[in-house]
Design a protein with these regions (language model features):
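A glycine-/small-polar-enriched, mobile loop at the entrance of the PLP active site in fold-type I
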Residues: 1-44, 49
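Conserved PLP-enzyme active-site core in the AAT-like
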Residues: 25-29, 38, 43, 47-194
Length: 194
């Protein structure tokens, strides 16, 4: 009853002076969840799919080459979206239930001496198959190749239930969602750089 009664308050208008007082502390608290010190958190009023689209459209442009893998339903949807938005996808098509192919990513990035690949995409937790991918391993592949590509992570069903170390792992943009892992939909750091 105590929790129910605490929620029994009038709605706050999002344009009122009270609204920022309520929401601004959330941004700093969410940085702790993502284990990040730098960068920005954006609370985005959409599904995880809407946040993916916004992240892609605000950081990349049609014709940009990206490295992606497909190994489950949500990585499949992310690849489809990238292609619909005009990105040139270098695809590692993997058996469902396997995760991000780190060795293939490392090989492709090492061979990309001209740095044509602008972003590397990794699905952190593939809900459809229950597979968790090694995001730190993707960063190691980028670093070993001395590759400047941005690292995008789909963690819609991961953040809040799996470890996410944006700062330590050098994640440039992470999309999470409220439903699968109980956190607000957001996107974060460095996603507007480069």
């Amino acid at each position: 009853d105590e929790v129910r009664m605490a929620m029994n308050v009038p709605m706050i208008d999002m344009r009122s002076a009270e609204y920022p007082k309520l929401t601004l502390p959330i941004f700093e608290d969410l940085k702790k969840v993502f284990k990040m010190k730098d960068g920005r958190v954006f609370i985005f009023p959409s599904s995880g799919t809407g946040a993916w689209e916004s992240a892609i459209q605000n950081t990349l442009k049609p014709g940009d080459k990206v490295l992606m893998s497909r190994f489950g339903q949500f990585s499949l949807l992310w690849v489809d979206m990238a292609e619909r938005l005009g990105l040139k996808v270098e695809l590692c098509d993997e058996e469902w239930g396997t995760g991000v192919p780190l060795e293939k990513y490392a090989d492709i990035l090492a061979k990309d001496k001209a740095h044509e690949i602008k972003a590397v995409f990794a699905t952190h937790n593939e809900t459809a198959t229950g597979v968790t991918s090694d995001i730190a391993g993707v960063r190691k592949a980028l670093d070993a190749a001395k590759h400047p590509a941005l690292l995008f992570v789909d963690s819609v069903s991961g953040v809040g239930s799996l470890d996410m170390r944006m700062g330590e792992w050098g994640v440039d943009c992470c999309v999470s969602g409220s439903c699968p892992s109980s956190w607000p939909i957001l996107w974060s750091p460095g996603s507007c750089s480069g």
